[in-house]
From Swiss-Prot:
PROSITE patterns in alphabetical order: NIR_SIR (PS00365)
Family: Belongs to the nitrite and sulfite reductase 4Fe-4S domain family.
Primary enzyme class: oxidoreductase
One GO biological process term: cysteine biosynthetic process
Protein name, entry field: Sulfite reductase [NADPH] hemoprotein beta-component 1
Subunit structure: Alpha(8)-beta(8). The alpha component is a flavoprotein, the beta component is a hemoprotein.
Requisite cofactors: siroheme; [4Fe-4S] cluster
Pathway where it operates: Sulfur metabolism; hydrogen sulfide biosynthesis; hydrogen sulfide from sulfite (NADPH route): step 1/1
Length: 570
């Protein structure tokens, strides 16, 4: 990215109300404990509505029945979403059995939702069950700390499980980074786990008393797979190996996909290369990036507060030099690396130690017992006999990891009997959506509930043009916050209003290019008309091995986004 307009290191002005809230919260306590005992409302009041996010929860309501309840003079049907902290997506079968039971017994929807942040969410937790869910997680060695709001969120790690020593090492670093950047406040333990208050004063040596200016996302990625979509994240450690052993990381900083419709000060941005660092400097560098963003990030405008905007304001080289100063190192030149794809390899893959790994495609990541496809029961039955663990992928799928040869047939039979290994087209495997309606308060258009039937129609277009064995990375996100990562898709739909989307084209299969808006505020049938024409051209005019996104750029259908801060909206 360019250094054309270096600006002030710190943005002066009136701080946002979120900054006041954090400062007055007594290190994230607020009055959450008192609010839990208020039976007059199903929700949290005042600052607590936002403070619970630091504890891994969002307050939501069922938007399908919001108007009906308002007509009955009832408050919305409040319930919480809880997101678990699960670095690298690894979960034991003991933990899985516990979360399966909680979902069945204590949530409105009865489902487990795998997310593209490589963890799981519960939707529909009533207020009376909020404390029990944290205690259940703690009882099996899990927590929900720092999975939302202005902290370092769940750390992602490439999912190919244990195919080499490299993957095991990378996963350990994901855990170390996650632990190192956690908040130190005792508020979580006091409120949810009934741990006694201690006399010592809380301190936050890394995050600070007002935490970060905005959410912060971190990945550890092993080329050539970009399954974790590094360019959606603030801080990325790209594993560099010599003779199959991890020796260090390339650091890329300042990716992020969230925008606001019509606000040209917002844009999606790919991460910038800072340089290579040996392993021993990893935690110092991670801390230096976070504290630089802590001190320089914009606290006067939350829509301009993420690391990507800080980099553009102060300049990449200035930010990089400050990270070097704080970490006490000089970055070496970037080591060579490349990404060739980011999909999961569905089915069996053999790893090291003669163990096998079974990747199961879970459409939209929603684990529930559907008619004729009891996915949730199937995974529970596998968890009862599997001696290894599960891994959640950043594509919202699930890996049954480290299966011995003599257990393979039994686990495969359970998976097949419960609809977990039904045949899936390459197109469906490479499509993804965020949750959106009915639970997300930000949703503008359907996403998860829209995707399956939409992909049926896209597959019809692919069949018509003779490319049914191909795939186009397709993503639907219900609003411009971009949880569905549509801003790294070949075909990205961004919700604008019920039944209407902005259509973005020109991303690539490996997730290294931002797509540009092609048509604005259009219906499903208009989207399909565009795809019918363009897929037809792709089928006839493409070069050998050329993906749809690359074709749309080469053919001049869409101009590539080269410098997002300046050309994203052109």
């Amino acid at each position: 990215m360019s250094e054309k307009h270096p600006g002030p290191l710190v943005v002066e002005g009136k701080l946002t109300d979120a900054e006041r809230m954090k400062l007055e919260s007594n290190y994230l306590r607020g009055t959450i404990a008192e609010d839990l005992n208020d039976g007059l409302t199903g929700g949290f009041k005042g600052d607590n509505f936002l403070l619970i996010r630091f504890h891994g929860m969002y307050q939501q309501d069922d938007r399908d029945i919001r108007a009906e309840r308002a007509a009955q003079k009832l408050e919305p049907r409040h319930a919480m979403l809880l997101r678990c902290r699960l670095p690298g997506g690894v979960i034991t079968t003991t933990q899985w059995k516990a979360i399966d039971k909680f979902a069945a017994d204590n949530t409105i929807y009865g489902s487990i939702r795998l997310t593209n942040r490589q963890t799981f969410q519960f939707h529909g937790i009533l207020k009376k069950n909020v404390k029990p869910v944290h205690q259940m997680l703690h009882s099996v060695g899990l927590d929900a700390l720092a999975t939302a709001n202005d902290m370092n969120r769940n750390v992602l790690c490439t999912s190919n499980p244990y195919e080499s020593q490299l993957h095991a090492e990378a996963y350990e670093w994901a855990k170390k980074i996650s632990e190192h950047l956690l908040p130190r406040t005792r508020a979580y333990a006091e409120i949810w786990l009934d741990q006694k208050k201690v006399a010592t004063t809380d301190e936050e040596p890394i995050l600070g008393q007002t935490y970060l200016p905005r959410k912060f996302k971190t990945t550890v990625v092993i080329p050539p797979q970009n399954d974790i979509d590094l360019h959606a994240n603030d801080m990325n450690f790209v594993a560099i190996a010599e003779n199959g052993k991890l020796v260090g990381f390339n650091l890329l900083v300042g990716g992020g996909l969230s925008i606001e419709h019509g606000n040209k000060k917002t844009y999606a941005r790919t991460a910038s290369e800072f340089g290579y660092l040996p392993l021993e400097h990893t935690l110092a560098v991670a801390e230096a990036v976070v504290t630089t963003q802590r001190d320089w990030g914009n606290r006067t405008d939350r829509k301009n507060a993420k690391t990507k905007y800080t980099l553009e304001r102060v300049g990449v080289e200035t930010f990089k030099a400050e990270v070097e100063r704080r970490a006490g190192i000089k970055f070496e030149p970037i080591r060579p690396y490349e990404f060739t794809g980011r999909g999961d390899r569905i089915g069996w893959v053999k790893g090291i130690d003669d163990k096998w790994h079974l990747t199961l495609f879970i459409e939209n990541g929603r684990i529930l017992d559907y008619p004729g496809r009891p996915l949730k029961t199937g995974l529970l039955e596998i968890a009862k006999i599997h001696k290894g663990e599960f891994r959640i992928t950043a594509n919202q799928n699930l890996i049954v990891a480290s299966v011995p040869e003599d257990q393979k047939a039994r686990i495969e039979k359970l998976a097949r009997d419960h609809g977990l290994m039904n045949a899936v087209t390459p197109q469906r495997e490479n499509s993804m959506a965020c949750v959106s309606f009915p639970t997300c308060p930000l949703a503008m258009a359907e996403a998860e509930r829209f995707l399956p039937s939409f992909i049926d129609k896209v597959e019809g277009v692919m069949n018509k043009h003779g490319v049914s064995d191909e795939h186009i990375v397709t993503r639907v996100t219900g609003c411009p916050n971009g949880c569905g990562r549509a801003m790294l898709a070949e075909v990205g739909l961004v919700g604008k209003a019920p039944g209407r989307y902005n259509l973005h084209l020109g991303g690539n299969r490996s997730g290294t290019r931002i797509p540009r808006m092609y048509r604005e505020n259009i219906t499903e049938s208009e989207i399909l008309d565009s795809l019918d024409e363009l897929v037809g051209r792709w089928a006839k005019e493409r070069e050998a091995g050329e993906g749809f996104g690359d074709f749309t750029v080469r053919a001049g259908i869409i101009r590539p986004v080269l410098d997002p801060a300046r050309d994203f909206w052109e």
